[in-house]
Amino acid sequence: RSDFHDFNIVGGFLTYFDIDKNLQIIHTLYPNITEFSLLTDNSLGGVTMQALVRDKVAGMKGIKMNYIDGRTETYASMLQIIRKMPSDMALLLGTWRVDCNDNFSIGNSSMQVNENNPTLPVFSISGIGMNGLAIGGYYPDFRHDGERLAEICMAYLERFEPQGFVYVSNSSNFDYQLMESFN
């Protein structure tokens, strides 16, 4: 691309987080839910994801979006906010690794979220929390990115072949046991 002429871009991955599709899924399963909270962390990915969601929901009627923002919240305050959320709201998981104090969360943090509000419908727009916390979501399929990235790098290093951009497809994923327990 002409706007990147001073960079040597030879390939990369393009992902799309489909907010509309996730809200559609939630509305299908929970038709009375119109209020949501998006959880994002204090990282570039978290800030970017929050900006995407803000942009997407700005023109939507009948949707109220709250933000649990890792730039201003600690892990403890995030848990406190989630504890107080009513079950007629849904929590959207975006990213959560780093809080406002640059503290990193650990792998079992999703269980703590669940323990704080076990009746809260939780959905993932990025794939996090699909280990017993999120009911489901529509998000990019990251499962084979490492292998594909290695192939792209090796093709460039060995043969100087630019690979272009690889589009990561999205898919719906659900935790069947959690869906049963919520319906």
Predicted features by range, described:
Residues 1-183:
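Short hydrophobic alpha-helices and adjacent helix-cap/hinge residues
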